[in-house]
């Protein structure tokens, strides 16, 4: 066989390879169809605030580990969403920074709430443009923490932040974003703040948000597919629904022990 004859031969694929290709394209088409439906549903909810349009699901968005995406379980996302909504009014704004599963939970709760219930404004700050199916999306890159629409500055009453990476740089820049978004204290009560991140970030996080009164809570968020790092929830308030209390600090325990020893 000459080289010329070899070049003229048709390339053939094995049946198993063809089946794998067919499955790949079928899954791709199904995912595209799912996103189209989700986008239509999100737009419908935004325009008409329909109460029976069905539940949105974070499962429509496959986790991208390159984006450090690890979705919360539905139970955790709903709990955090309800804490953000507790006592909120319709003239408030809730910002969700790098925690899209909580944003989806907020959308579902507000979408199914009874008529007359307060419906605060939502804004999602997220790097993943797949979430552009939601009109509330604002593109966010923690490396440029203040590169955001000017109308969001000092506009948010409640904020949840889950920095994508367990690094001092990422945590510090995310804190800059939170400060930029927060309403000044003199205008209202202090911004209600929740930060969810690794246990090893505890000393840094509580220092970065000291002015907010942020403390470690006894609630540990659960991720849908598990997470090897120990994860904490930090907040500047204790839950009125008993979802969490603040953990006792070491210095508090020492002071209490000294007080008991004095016998007063």
Regions inferred by a protein language model and the residue ranges of each:
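C-terminal substrate-binding/active-site "lid" region of AdoMet-derived donor-dependent transferases
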Residues: 168-243
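Short, polar loop motifs at secondary-structure junctions
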Residues: 99-101, 124-131, 198-202
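Short, aromatic/basic amphipathic alpha-helical patches
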Residues: 105-117, 135-137, 203-213
């Amino acid at each position: 066989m000459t080289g010329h004859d070899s070049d003229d031969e048709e390339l053939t694929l094995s049946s198993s390879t063809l089946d794998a290709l067919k499955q790949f394209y079928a899954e791709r088409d199904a995912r595209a169809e799912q996103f189209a439906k989700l986008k239509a549903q999100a737009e419908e909810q935004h325009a008409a605030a329909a109460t029976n349009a069905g539940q949105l699901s974070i499962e429509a968005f496959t986790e991208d580990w390159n984006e450090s995406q690890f979705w919360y379980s539905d139970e955790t996302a709903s709990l955090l969403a309800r804490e953000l909504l507790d006592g909120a009014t319709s003239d408030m704004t809730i910002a969700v920074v790098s925690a899209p599963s909580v944003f989806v939970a907020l959308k579902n709760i507000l979408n199914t709430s009874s008529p007359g219930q307060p419906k605060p404004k939502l804004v999602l700050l997220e790097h993943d443009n797949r979430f552009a199916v939601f009109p509330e999306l604002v593109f966010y890159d923690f490396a440029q923490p203040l590169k955001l629409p000017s109308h969001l500055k000092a506009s948010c009453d409640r904020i949840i932040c889950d920095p994508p990476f367990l690094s001092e740089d990422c945590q510090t820049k995310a804190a800059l974003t939170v400060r930029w978004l927060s309403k000044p204290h003199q205008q209202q009560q202090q911004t209600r703040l929740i930060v969810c991140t690794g246990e090893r970030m505890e000393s840094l996080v509580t220092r970065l948000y000291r002015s907010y009164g942020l403390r470690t809570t006894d609630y540990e968020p659960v991720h849908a597919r598990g997470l090897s790092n120990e994860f904490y929830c930090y907040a500047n308030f204790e839950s009125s629904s008993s979802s969490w209390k603040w953990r006792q600090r070491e210095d508090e325990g020492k002071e209490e022990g000294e007080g008991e020893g004095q016998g007063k």
